Amino acid sequence: MSERKIINDPVFGFINIPKGLLYNIVCHPLLQRLTRIKQLGLSSAVYPGAQHTRFQHSLGAFYLMSEAISHLTTKGNFIFDSEAEAVQAAILLHDIGHGPFSHVLENTLVTGVSHEEISLMLMERINKDLKGQLNLAIQIFKDEYPKKFLHQLVSGQLDMDRLDYLRRDSFYTGVTEGNIGSARIIKMLDVKDDHLVVESKGIYSIENFLTSRRLMYWQVYLHKTSVRSEE
């Protein structure tokens, strides 16, 4: 029996999903629901190619998380296998709370509660199905785990969420400004006092990342036609 599932991703190529907890998460109906939710909501009104889904984004973020854990480990940062699996689970589930049309729903039907809060509720529901196997992942997601850098990899200024969605949204919209060097940025990451840091030689890559993110907001996320469609 195969010990992993291989998924071919248009952005990063082959993504390996190990059998066990992570594979069970990918197959769970609540995560599979994201295969029917567009990553960019109504942005396809402007960029017809923007048909990619939250599920694809979750897989891409998982791939980058796997790369980040590998690189941090080679730099002498000790990460238990259980911690690696937990932070991978957390990034797979980080967007599970998104509803139809993505952020549009937060401003219409569901008000007063963020998709992050809904994500946490659904993670706890899945945790019951998996008999507590997500306890550590939920701790990391809620930033209640001592190794703060693990949460920062899931939700922070240089998290794997942002590194994926900029690359992915750039790919599917055709807006090349978002095509950041995610591999280079990940290689420049390190840990100091349990917090995520960047090596000095990676500063230029971070500057490019911040510029790319700003340009993507101008050209894609806050495009006047997309915003009007969502209103």
Please name every model-derived segment.
Residues 1-38, 45-89, 97-231:
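Sequence-structural signature of the catalytic-core scaffold of metal-dependent phosphohydrolases
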